[in-house]
């Protein structure tokens, strides 16, 4: 049986600096059937139109004003044929991992779960990661492959490619930002109002 291709978009929220960053650091992947990538990308344009944002401009969660607008975004995301995977790190509980290694270390858990989903769905993943200052594709691949035997259950044969791309260049990276940052705000404020964001997408998680 031929495998099915998926595009996986990864972003992060929070600051992983120990003792000086945010309490939570979150990695989020949205998993999209490749044959529906364009269709779902057009839904980002619909969101921008509803918010009166130029479709050529970046959709960025922290720039969106007003609870109703943010809730509209999450309702739209909840209606899409996507799977959302989150890894939530409580940075205040980390004792042995240097802050500059937190992203690499916990991305292993994210990749592990991505490949589990690929295996369950006879799929292969094209992974696109939102660029960040110190993130190197080679370092990421080498880290995951080197530690695969001891820490993670990552089937690298189910990963076709990894690319690191600026967020503004991919609409679905912007959607991943919304999923990740909304979860971050829900945990930060810890109230029913902000948890409504997550209620809208709970069937996708």
What does each model-identified segment do?
Residues 1-205:
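Phosphate-ester processing/binding pockets and catalytic centers
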């Amino acid at each position: 049986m031929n495998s099915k291709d998926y595009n996986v978009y990864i972003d992060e929220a929070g600051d992983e600096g120990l003792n000086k960053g945010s309490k939570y650091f979150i990695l989020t992947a949205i998993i999209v059937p490749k044959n529906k990538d364009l269709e779902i990308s057009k839904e980002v344009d619909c969101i921008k139109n509803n918010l009166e944002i130029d479709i050529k401009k970046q959709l960025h969660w922290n720039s969106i004003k007003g609870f109703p607008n943010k809730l509209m975004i999450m309702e739209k995301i909840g209606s899409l044929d996507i799977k959302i995977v989150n890894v939530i790190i409580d940075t205040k509980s980390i004792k042995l991992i240097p802050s500059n290694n937190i992203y690499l270390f916990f991305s292993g858990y994210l990749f592990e779960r991505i490949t589990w989903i690929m295996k369950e769905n006879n799929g292969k993943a094209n992974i696109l990661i939102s660029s960040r200052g110190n993130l190197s594709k080679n370092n990421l691949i080498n880290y995951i492959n080197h530690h695969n035997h001891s820490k993670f259950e990552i089937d690298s044969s189910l990963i076709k490619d990894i690319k690191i791309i600026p967020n503004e260049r991919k609409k679905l990276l912007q959607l991943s930002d919304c999923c990740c940052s909304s979860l971050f705000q829900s945990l930060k404020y810890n109230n029913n109002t902000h948890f409504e964001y997550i209620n809208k997408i709970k069937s996708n998680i």
